[in-house]
A protein has these predicted regions:
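Conserved beta-strand-loop-alpha-helix junction that forms the acyl-donor binding cleft
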Residues: 155-165
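GNAT-family acyltransferases
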Residues: 1-130, 143
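Glycine-rich acyl-CoA binding loop
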Residues: 133-134
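Conserved GNAT acetyl-CoA-binding A-motif
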Residues: 146-156
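Conserved catalytic-core motifs of GNAT/GCN5-like acyltransferases
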Residues: 174-178
Length: 178
């Protein structure tokens, strides 16, 4: 371990570091699912139908938005995600049937430092407790680290959202504090 002039551990120098690329602009192909950048015209109706299969609003509790109550509200929700400067939202497509079944996003993207966050993860009932969710996150991580050369990926969730915290830990993320 490298140390500074005071004997403090400071980690290894990165003299050849180059800024990473921007994630979320290319489709990502897996065995069970495919991720595509959010396209409102192509996926809006299918996503609305997928989220309508939920019995209630509980899946929206920890998101920044309440569950849209109409197709028009849902369109505004998608437009807000698509127009945000600090996120690239991806649509999860089930390869078995070609249906859009959820969304996830690259957030707080910082190519200069090689850091990005995964968040606004919203799986419809059509993909919960299936290989689709794990593979979607794997595809995002592989894209960040292997394709683009990122050094760090963060998973931020509400501290009360136990299912999200458990999923993050299962996928290898470590709690760093609140």
């Amino acid at each position: 371990m490298r140390r500074n002039q005071y004997g403090q551990p400071i980690g290894e120098a990165l003299p050849h570091w180059q800024p990473a690329g921007m994630p979320g602009h290319t489709p990502l192909q897996g065995r069970f699912c495919r991720l595509e950048p959010l396209n409102l015209e192509r996926w809006g109706d299918a996503l609305y139908q997928a989220y309508q299969t939920a019995e209630d609003d509980r899946d929206w509790t920890y998101l920044f938005w309440e569950r849209p109550q109409s197709r028009a509200d849902f369109q505004r929700y998608l437009q807000a995600q698509a127009s945000s400067a600090d996120r690239n939202t991806m649509v999860v497509i089930d390869r078995a049937n070609g249906r859009a079944v959820g969304t996830c996003a690259f957030l707080r993207i910082d190519p200069a430092n090689g850091v990005a966050e995964l968040g606004t993860i919203n799986w419809s009932p059509l993909m919960k407790r299936s290989a689709l969710g794990s593979e979607a996150i794997f595809l995002m991580l592989r894209h960040l680290f292997d394709d683009l050369g990122y050094r760090r990926c963060e998973w931020k969730c509400d501290s009360l959202n136990l299912p999200s915290r458990q999923a993050a830990e299962r996928l290898g993320f470590r709690y760093e504090g609140t």
